[in-house]
Design a protein with these regions (language model features):
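S-adenosylmethionine-dependent methyltransferases
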Residues: 1-122
């Protein structure tokens, strides 16, 4: 799902171009729980209030057993104290929208030592 109509259109176009069957919904699921096993969140910690609500929601999904993965370019409101880094890489930035061509991106997960997933140093 995506809350931005332009991003929904872009995701659908990308799926078509790559012959990937995918359903993209224009909806806000924060606070919902349909029993997902895996939850992916991308670049969602850019505002204080929204970041707090999203953190609470993702943490509740994690606490009931979902694997919660977060892609983040280093936003200020990322709850690093609740997360572990899974991987990091250099990612191209969006030209005129960013002040650098390439930046560090990371994939985080809510900390869960019992799941046996590897830890990386930041």
């Amino acid at each position: 799902t995506e809350i931005d109509a332009f991003a929904v259109h872009a995701a659908r176009a990308n799926a078509r171009l790559n012959d990937v069957p995918m359903q993209v919904l224009h909806a806000d699921l924060v606070g919902c729980d349909d029993g997902w096993d895996v939850v992916l969140a991308g670049d969602v910690f850019y505002e204080t209030e929204a970041g707090a609500a999203i953190t609470d929601w993702l943490e509740s999904l994690h606490d009931r057993g979902a694997l919660v993965l977060i892609g983040d370019p280093g936003r200020a409101y990322l709850p690093k104290d609740k997360l572990s880094i899974m991987t990091r890489f250099e990612a191209p930035r969006a030209g005129d929208l960013e002040d650098q061509d390439v930046g560090a991106a990371r994939v985080w997960r809510f900390s869960a030592p019992s799941r046996g997933l590897p830890e990386l140093e930041d």
